[in-house]
Amino acid sequence: PNDLVIDGRKLCGILAEAVSLGDQPAVVIGLGLNTSLTKDELPVPHATSLHLEGISYERNELAVRVLTALHHRLTQWETNDPTLMPDYRAVSATIGQNVRVILPNDTELLGTAEGVADDGRLQVRDQTGTLHELTAGDVTHLRLQ
């Protein structure tokens, strides 16, 4: 659930890692945005780029827009804005998808992503009907071959 996608194709990957700065928790956020890749340069067939989507941009303006949007969402998180999670769920490309999750203990969970809890936990129902609420793991959408 940490990718930005256009029509099912990955445009941007986002990584977040919790760290401790003394007694203050913090999160380090990194993002990789495919801006000018051509079809031949794509790392995987289910990726895309702003260039391939016909989206023109000026690099500095793009950076300002991304950082402004990130600041807005972080402010919503910090203030417990009740619209944040419904907004997120409305655009989630993961909810409703069959997924494979590699958990921190290297076990695999297969199931359907049913939702995201208000605290950000991904809700995955496995094949036995058990609902798992996950705080960490590597989530992959299962695609038909």
Indicate where each model-derived feature is located.
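Long, positively charged amphipathic alpha-helical accessory segments at protein N-termini or as interdomain linkers
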Residues: I6-Q145
